[in-house]
Amino acid sequence: MEGHIPVLKDAILTTFKNLTGFLIDGTFGGGGHSEALLEQNNNLTIIGLDIDPEAINRASILKEKYPKRFSFEAINFSQIESLGKTFDGILLDLGVSSFQLDNAQRGFSFRNEGPLDMRMNPQKGLSAQQFLQTASENQLIQAIKEFGEEPQWRSVVKNILAYRETNEWATTLQFADFLDKHTSLYRSKKPGVHPATRVFQGLRIAINDELGHLTKGLEAAFNTLK
């Protein structure tokens, strides 16, 4: 599809080159992987899965192009078993997509001004802004220390708790600037690494329950593979 070149395209095409039957693209995203596989292999039928509402429009293009070999379900890959089928292959390309990063209004990027959101599905759950204002200290520690692997997590959590007592963050750049002020070691020890990198990653993983879905998804994958 125009505007997006999948990073893992060649490796994925090689992996599934001789696969016949049904394949689940559990992280449809921009649809680049599904499109490339459908073009390469006429013996493959693909079901794309994604909870991002914007993926629906991109999926409709493939539906028109491959009406008998492609379909789409707006569910998380952890819900594969709800389809009631078995599959010959399952593809998962985890993390945030370039479509989501490039759209500042989605709130995934700390380099562009946008609402502090980060939800894979903006219609459900807490946004990053809401999470930052309401999460307990332990929830913040889990997100920033465990999921983000931020070495200065103590300082970050302490300052978040203090700041939110009388203030709140509204945008990505506002929060990124806040992190820049409270992670000064990056400037001397990690030149070129933005101080918001790990914290944004941790928040995204936390509010989307990415590891929880991965655990359920892997179990479901083993249960549904032929």
Residue ranges and their predicted role:
Residues 1-226:
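S-adenosyl-L-methionine-dependent methyltransferase catalytic core, i.e., the SAM/SAH-binding region
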